[in-house]
Amino acid sequence: MKTSEWIDISQPLNNDIATWPGDTPFSYEVSWSKEESGSVNVGKLTMSIHTGTHIDAPFHFDNEGKKVIDLDVQVYVGPARIIDVSNLESIGKKELENFHLEGVERLLLRTSSHGKANEFPDVIPHLRADIAPFLSEKGIRLIGVDVPSVDPLDDKELAAHHQLFKHGIHILENVVLDHVADGDYELIALPLALSDADGSPVRAVIRPI
């Protein structure tokens, strides 16, 4: 039987990609060309960790929180379910109660609210804090969203971030889901082995189960 092909659900990183207002712009350049070195091109990359498709570590919002290197990589690999939650201003327990989520460990939410990697949104659907205990009761260990944050963009309390990790749920942001159907997939979204970082870019891919 032919194995299904992997589907990329990552935002391509290039010099046009949007970043959080005031954060470090993405930049890639060849800093040492083949003509200069005589053998190879060597690139230089400058970026914020929270550009494009990425994961958050607790250190992002808690000075005492775990850093990327301390996170369990098993969480970012395995079966995942994509569900559609379009046309909602916020998402919490109430909005998810009618979905069958028993046995789901990784949940990706399609809000279809923005979808423009080169434009930072003015407002996004956000997760309410009551989603965390609900997801935890279902056994979910990772939540993914197709927007830059699980909290409102102008929020300073970051209640969803705090409650999700308090309940053992990891955060994946800025996945691209408009080109894939609802259903069950195998997910790989591994962070880099960054020792002191508050997050990491990932190449997120899925394939149907």
Curated annotation (Swiss-Prot):
Known catalytic reactions: N-formyl-L-kynurenine + H2O = L-kynurenine + formate + H(+)
Binding sites annotated in the UniProt record for Zn(2+) 1: 50, 54, 56, 173
Keyword annotations from UniProtKB, A to Z: Hydrolase, Metal-binding, Tryptophan catabolism, Zinc
Name of the protein this chain belongs to: Kynurenine formamidase
Protein purpose: Catalyzes the hydrolysis of N-formyl-L-kynurenine to L-kynurenine, the second step in the kynurenine pathway of tryptophan degradation.
Active-site residues, Swiss-Prot/TrEMBL: 60 (proton donor/acceptor)
Organism: Bacillus cereus (strain ZK / E33L)
Gene Ontology biological-process entries: anthranilate metabolic process; L-tryptophan catabolic process to kynurenine
GO molecular function, one term: zinc ion binding
Gene: kynB
Sequence positions that bind Zn(2+) 2: 56, 161, 173
Coiled coil: none
Keyword Metal-binding listed: yes
